[in-house]
Amino acid sequence: MKCPYCSSAQGRCTTTSSGRSITECSSCGRVMEERQTQNHHLFHLRAQDTPLCLVTSDLQTAAQPSPEDEEDPFEPTGFITAFSTWSLEPSPIFARSSLSFSGHLAELERTLELASSTSNSNSSTVVVDNLRAYMQIIDVASILGLDCDISEHAFQLFRDCCSATCLRNRSVEALATACLVQAIREAQEPRTLQEISIAANVQQKEIGKYIKILGEALQLSQPINSNSISVHMPRFCTLLQLNKSAQELATHIGEVVINKCFCTRRNPISISAAAIYLACQLEDKRKTQAEICKITGLTEVTLRKVYKELLENWDDLLPSNYTPAVPPEKAFPTTTISTTRSTTPRAVDPPEPSFVEKDKPSAKPIETFDHTYQQPKGKEDKQPKFRQPWLFGTASVMNPAEMISEPAKPNAMDYEKQQLDKQQQQQLGDKETLPIYLRDHNPFPSNPSPSTGISTINWSFRPSVVPGSSSNLPVIHPPKLPPGYAEIRGSGSRNADNPHGDF
């Protein structure tokens, strides 16, 4: 038999105060095994053969007239015959049986008795609190796979804390979990606070609160290197199935970061995770951020931030005689983890939209012009912001007041209509420069009715010829009126009865 606490193979049999038989360890004195003995009252049936003697005379008697029966065993033959009786009688037997099982309950009883004897109060409340704390510590320790020495030390811390402070209105389970965290740190076991919180079903904030209470009650100090890189790194590398070279490189990077204070705002677990990811990049190990975060309990955002901080000093992180499997320029070019592009993109002006893109109808209206170029009425003296009025098909810059009513950018049909109006205006010319009798002249007359006797004369207007230019087309100038005569008004047509156009 082997002791589950100290692994000793020597034990001795003894009896508890309640009369139970146990086997305790000779080295540590803890209960290894408990035996339960039971007496059994049995009866054994034994066969008993009792002789019965019957004596008969040897003399022959007178012959009887009864018929002879040769098969009769009781027929006297004249000799002495011995008879016996056979029977089954129960005989009592005193037997004892023994049942052996684990000694956890007996160890719990021994621990509670020891706690009750050392405590100042022997009330039932203290016993119940000790029982709850012991069960909490044992359950969490079994889930995390901790040694029995750690759980025993945690329960001792709980008893000392109960003696030093009051547990009224406080959670016994949270205090027991805090005692287990302190025992784990003193034993330098690689267990994170997040793992303990999940196993104990207690929030990390609550555990931290009771760790502070425990430290104030027992005047405890933080153990040296209880949460260092060397504690967590081997466990993380083992769970990630990394080889020895990657593990040594990650440990070296983490220790350099801690010693040179490159990441002062980060805890050792975050630094360990980032160092593992950096070592995997240099050793060409295919480990994703999600895999590392699942093992270490971090988020991918935190991992990327710490990794970015490590890259700022990556020249000082690597050993002097180390040759990476992947060159650092390829392993981590000066970029972020999530993208291969530079973090500060070059400032390039957006290209101007082409004329064809302006004509393309868009399925979704663009409201850029409404918000960008919208100006209140009464401020028409200000120059509009856009520089390309020809894209809208107008001869001059549009009035900002007109742009307020425009819901969206003009499409291709509006542009063609504006171009047609522009051509007509160029052909008609500016009417303000014409004489009054030619302003109402229509250069594109409709078809005259053949039934009317009115003859129509078309006055075609031509711009003045530039001197020096040769042209074969005749130029018709409007007649000049002498001073003092009223201006002749007409529709551009003359009648034979009224040659001067008088009304």
From Swiss-Prot:
Disulfide bonds: none annotated. One of its GO terms (cellular component) is plastid outer membrane. The keyword Transcription applies. Residues 328-366, 411-431, 436-455, 468-503 are annotated as: Disordered. GO terms for molecular function: rDNA binding; TBP-class protein binding; zinc ion binding. Transmembrane segments: none annotated. Residues 333-346 have a biased composition (Low complexity). It is a peripheral membrane protein. Residues 355-366 have a biased composition (Basic and acidic residues). Keywords: Chloroplast, Membrane, Metal-binding, Nucleus, Plastid, Plastid outer membrane, Transcription, Transcription regulation, Zinc, Zinc-finger. A zinc finger (TFIIB-type) spans 1-33. It holds the Pfam family TFIIB. It is found in: Plastid, Chloroplast outer membrane; Nucleus. Ubiquinated. Subsequent degradation by the proteasome pathway. GO terms for biological process: transcription preinitiation complex assembly. PANTHER family: TRANSCRIPTION INITIATION FACTOR IIB (PTHR11618:SF13), TRANSCRIPTION INITIATION FACTOR IIB-RELATED (PTHR11618). Plant-specific TFIIB-related protein that may be involved in an intracellular signaling pathway between plastids and the nucleus. May act as general transcription factor (GTF) of RNA polymerase I-dependent transcription and rRNA synthesis. Forms a ternary complex with TBP2 and the rDNA promoter region. This is Plant-specific TFIIB-related protein 1.
